[in-house]
Amino acid sequence: MSLLLFAASQVFAADATFTTKSLTPETALKAAQAALAKCRADGFQVAVAVVDRAGLTQVLLRDRFAGAHTPDFAVNKAWTAVSFRTNTTDLEKATRTGQPMAGIRNIPRFASVGGGQMIQAGGSLLGGIGVSGAPGGDNDDVCAAAGIKAIADELELG
């Protein structure tokens, strides 16, 4: 009986911890800077946030003339993408009035407009990037994608 309990405790002990991968602050900053640069090149003043896989802010940048609301909204977009494991453009469609998931729009910090994207590599969620301030979520999405593209070669894909 004691051998059985010992073997069972070994199985549980093996599952008591896990390892995750995270973006370094330098990598998060590079993504944010690239997203900001893309929006600037397109003539948009925005804020960019990069959050870790838990939704905690790693980097927040606001361009000179970006609106006062943009930093918080950029963080919320990144947080939403990470929290729901879905890019915010996809959530916008899935949570429209009359859709089964419409109620989640009432969750504090939930952002149901484009501009929040997951940062993934090798099948793992590493974090999220949110952009706010360009006219329309589609323009925010373009800038967020530029931020991810800027770090793609540095991410571990295996």
What are these regions (language model features)?
Residues 1-10:
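Bacterial N-terminal signal peptides
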